[in-house]
């Protein structure tokens, strides 16, 4: 899929991924599928990646969501700070990654992905350094 292709296009090994700004709509359908995709792409390394949903703070910006979330991802890299996934209250057993629940944190990161998928069939991912 697009995450694997973004990593390949950027010349980044899956073990180098530090942070992913997920599409993260907070729905079972999206979040469980996106979690499974992250596991498929990153393997055992998936558990070490800070996976956040900035959509939890902005709401769904429809056509603007991908651009705004890419900016959030660039700022996270610049500031070495993973923003929180706010309103994270009831973990889904199928969603077993580090979602940075409710409180952001400083962390060392070199590479990050920003995912955008859904409405209209778009499916995009950008790798940033």
Outline where the language-model segments fall.
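Conserved "HGTGT" condensation-loop signature of ketosynthase/thiolase-family condensing enzymes
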Residues: 1-129
């Amino acid at each position: 899929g697009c995450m694997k292709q973004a990593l390949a296009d950027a010349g980044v090994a899956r073990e180098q991924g530090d942070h992913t700004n997920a599409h993260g709509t907070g729905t079972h359908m999206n979040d469980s599928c996106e979690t499974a995709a992250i596991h498929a792409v990153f393997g055992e390394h998936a558990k070490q990646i800070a996976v956040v949903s900035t959509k939890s703070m902005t709401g769904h910006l429809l056509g603007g969501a991908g651009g705004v979330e890419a900016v959030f991802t660039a700022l996270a890299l610049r500031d070495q700070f993973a923003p929180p996934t706010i309103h994270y209250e009831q973990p889904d057993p199928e969603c077993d990654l580090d979602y940075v629940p409710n409180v952001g944190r400083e962390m060392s990161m070199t590479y990050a992905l920003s995912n955008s998928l859904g409405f209209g069939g778009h499916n995009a991912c950008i790798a940033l350094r």
